[in-house]
């Protein structure tokens, strides 16, 4: 379970980025954080990860095995390491897996799942496409077997086919390894396919919180309706 109680945060004392955030996410629930750029979505993720401490309020996690997948994969990889080295580091550091044969078998299984060519393993991050690197980014996080995964705009560099492939993989992971994941996105179609609950942020405050089946409910907050209408166009 993840719980935020009256969380307020700002990068300086004069302006708060998040104000009085109250969220409870039980195990098994996948949540989408929806809102425009600058509303505080990524800051919220950083707080859950423990990268920052709230100015006020408390954050409780029942499981410390939390990882994130960021929007820009190039900054997440060591530029001097091959893709294979970066992936195997996750297996060693998070799972204590040192046997090369076992590591290779896991990599081959995941390459097939993510529809990626094994020849790409010898490449540096700068030598593969943005979409391929983002899929490797997701793969590396899943190889580490986190219990909670925070996904920050992870489909922004993917084409339609690769996007659906990643969505299917993440949904399958909730059945096997993940307790839940949090998806931060401005893309409503991604959230509709991935999560069962949406929290809407505006100007650092929660303005709406509902089950995905209630997205088009007449009782939705006016800002939520505005986002839905904008996406429809």
Swiss-Prot record:
SUPFAM superfamilies named in the record: P-loop containing nucleoside triphosphate hydrolases
Name the UniProt record assigns to this protein: Nickel import system ATP-binding protein NikE
Entry keyword Nucleotide-binding: yes
Record key words, sorted: ATP-binding, Cell membrane, Ion transport, Membrane, Nickel, Nickel transport, Nucleotide-binding, Translocase, Transport
UniProt lineage: Bacteria, Bacillati, Bacillota, Bacilli, Bacillales
Entries under CDD domains matching the protein: ABC_NikE_OppD_transporters
Residues that bind ATP: 35-42
GO cellular component terms listed in the entry, alphabetical order: plasma membrane
Broad EC category: translocase
InterPro entries linked to this entry: AAA+_ATPase, ABC_transp_ATP-bind, ABC_transporter-like_ATP-bd, P-loop_NTPase
Family: Belongs to the ABC transporter superfamily.
One Pfam family this sequence matches: ABC_tran
Subunit structure of this chain's protein: The complex is composed of two ATP-binding proteins (NikD and NikE), two transmembrane proteins (NikB and NikC) and a solute-binding protein (NikA).
Keyword DNA-binding listed: no
Organism: Staphylococcus aureus (strain N315)
Molecular function per GO: ABC-type nickel transporter activity; ATP binding; ATP hydrolysis activity
UniProt-annotated location(s): Cell membrane
Gene: nikE
PANTHER family: ABC TRANSPORTER, ATP-BINDING PROTEIN, TRANSPORT ATP-BINDING PROTEIN
Stated role: Part of the ABC transporter complex NikABCDE (Opp2) involved in nickel import. Probably responsible for energy coupling to the transport system.
EC number: 7.2.2.11
Topology relative to the membrane: Peripheral membrane protein
Top-rank taxon, per record: Bacteria
All residue ranges annotated as the ABC transporter domain in the record: 2-228
Reactions catalysed: Ni(2+)(out) + ATP + H2O = Ni(2+)(in) + ADP + phosphate + H(+)
């Amino acid at each position: 379970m993840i719980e935020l109680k009256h969380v307020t945060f700002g990068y300086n004392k004069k302006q708060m980025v998040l104000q009085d955030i109250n969220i409870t996410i039980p195990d098994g629930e996948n949540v989408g954080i929806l809102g425009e750029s600058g509303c505080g979505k990524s800051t919220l993720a950083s707080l859950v990860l423990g990268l920052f401490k709230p100015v006020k309020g408390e954050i409780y996690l029942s499981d410390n095995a939390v990882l994130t997948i960021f929007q820009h994969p190039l900054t997440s990889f060591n530029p001097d390491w091959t893709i294979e080295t970066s992936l195997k580091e996750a297996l060693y550091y998070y799972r204590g897996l040192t046997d090369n044969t076992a590591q290779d078998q896991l990599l081959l299984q995941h390459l097939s799942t993510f529809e990626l060519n094994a020849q790409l393993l010898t490449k540096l991050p700068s030598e593969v496409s943005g979409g391929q690197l983002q899929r490797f980014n997701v793969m590396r996080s899943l190889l580490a077997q986190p219990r909670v995964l925070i996904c920050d705009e992870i489909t922004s560099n993917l084409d339609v086919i690769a996007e659906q492939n990643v969505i299917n993989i993440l949904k399958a992971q909730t059945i096997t390894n993940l307790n839940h994941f949090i998806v931060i996105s401005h893309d409503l179609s991604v959230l509709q396919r991935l999560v069962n609950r949406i929290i809407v942020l505006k100007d650092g405050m929660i303005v709406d919180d509902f089950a995905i089946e209630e997205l088009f409910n007449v009782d939705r907050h006016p800002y939520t309706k505005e986002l839905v209408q904008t996406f429809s166009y």
